[in-house]
C-alpha cells in the first residue's frame, strides 16, 4: 500500500503502476518505509507502525520533525536510516533506465533550470503529479 496525499500522483499510481495507492490508512503495519522524508511523512510513519515494528527511512526531504519519539520508545519501534548504494548499483540502475527495463518514465517532468525553485515549490504543495523534476539548462 502506498500512502500518497497528492491526488494527482495517487491517480497516476493507481492507473499506470498497478499498485494500491490511498490518501490515508487506518491500519498499522509492521514495516513502514518513508521514501520521502518530510515532517508529514515521518508523522504518518511514526503513527502507523505497529508496536515492535520497523520504520525504514530513506527520504531526505527535510532534516527535522515528525518523529513521535515517546511512542517509538514506549512501543519499542526500530528506526533504521538507509541511504547507500555502490557504484555498481548506480551503473546497473542507469543501464536499466537506458534499456527501458524500468518501464515508461513519463512520471518524470522536465523543466528549464531557471524554473527550479518553482518546480520544487509545486512538488511540496502537491500541484504537480511528478515526484521528480529533471532540470536542464537546455530544456
Question: How does the language model describe each region?
Answer:
Residues 28-29, 38, 79, 90, ...:
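Phenylalanine-focused residue identity feature
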Residues 7-78:
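Glycine-rich cofactor phosphate-binding loops and adjacent beta1-alpha1 units
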Residues 6-7, 37, 61-62, 85-86, ...:
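Glycine-rich beta-alpha junction loops
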Residues 32, 59, 80, 103-106, ...:
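A general structural-boundary detector
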Residues 43, 87, 91-139:
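C-terminal hydrophobic helical "lid"/dimerization subdomain
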Residues 19-21, 79, 103-104, 130:
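Residue-level detector of short coil/turn "hinge" positions at structural boundaries
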Residues 54, 67-106:
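Rossmann-fold dehydrogenase core element
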Residues 2-3:
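Conserved SAM-binding motif I beta-strand of class I
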